[in-house]
A protein has these predicted regions:
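Catalytic phosphate/metal-binding cores of nucleic-acid and nucleotide-processing enzymes, i.e., regions
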Residues: 1-122
């Protein structure tokens, strides 16, 4: 029987995958990534995003903001991943999730979209 923490992690990884699905992002939840990620590079993250030419690796983290819980070091979370999604417990302000990405992913995928949709300054 899985531990309470493992079950909670799986639940929130599933919720984040559902959110990505709702945005039209083609992604797959990695089964047993936490158990075997240190053994196989393809299991190093919680979710993979499939693009035409490559795969992006996404790590999911959940924190209850009402309890004092240690926030993971973002540098460590992104060390072997392309994107990190931090989900917080419900309640509080408007921010429910924070998406962080490494510089290469931002430059390759996000910056061109921002450039395409920019408002010209007069």
């Amino acid at each position: 029987m899985p531990s309470k923490e493992k079950s909670k992690g799986t639940y929130h990884e599933t919720k984040i995958k559902e959110w990505l699905d709702s945005l039209g992002v083609v992604c797959t939840k990695q089964i047993a990534s936490g158990q075997h990620g240190h053994l196989r590079a393809d299991l190093r993250s919680d979710i993979t995003i499939s693009l035409q030419t490559e795969t992006l690796y996404v790590e999911c983290k959940y924190r209850n903001v009402n309890k004092k819980s240690r926030f993971p070091n973002i540098w460590e979370v992104l060390e072997n991943n392309d994107i990190a999604i931090f989900k917080k417990s419900e309640g509080g302000k408007n921010i429910k999730q924070i998406v962080l990405m490494n510089q290469d992913v931002f430059e390759k995928y996000t910056a061109p979209t921002l450039h395409k949709h920019r408002k010209e300054l007069k």
